[in-house]
Amino acid sequence: MCIRDRKEENTNAQAIALTMKALYLSNMTDLFGDMPFKEAFKGIDENIMQPKFDDQKVIYDSLLMDLERANTLYTKTSTIDAKRDLLYNGDVTKWRKFTNSLYLRLLMRVSNRRDMNSAERIKTVFENPSQYPIFESNDDNATLKYSGTRPFVNDFGDNATDAVSYTHLTLPTIL
């Protein structure tokens, strides 16, 4: 999604890609701590088969910057193709709320670290609701709804076989 949309200058799709990247990689670093990040996903293009591990602080700094950038990329002039948007059906406002709510979640995770300046950043979000819209009700949640009928049983496709996930093989093309 992101590579094609960069060429087309679809800033909303770029913002969504940054948001989903932050969601997935924040979950990974929360589970595993330090992990490959800066050199991750460069095996094919740059032949880095054993990426070095980065500190969790470096990862969080980068993800928070990505979310800040994503928040500024959303525009009402650029549309999101509702057929490609499985979570919000093309609603830019809901995507922006998701991005900023995720931003708050990550700031809360690092709230005990003074060097991350999370208290000031959290305060900025709450004091500027027009600049940083956030979830206000359950209607804003990012919920993937399964229809239960073919071909719409699992919209993300079958990515696992015998408990082995193949998502990591396709992730570089998505990002």
Label every PLM stretch briefly.
Residues 170-175:
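A short, hydrophobic C-terminal helix/tail in secreted or cell-surface proteins
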Residues 4-20, 24-169:
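Structured, solvent-exposed acidic/aromatic patches
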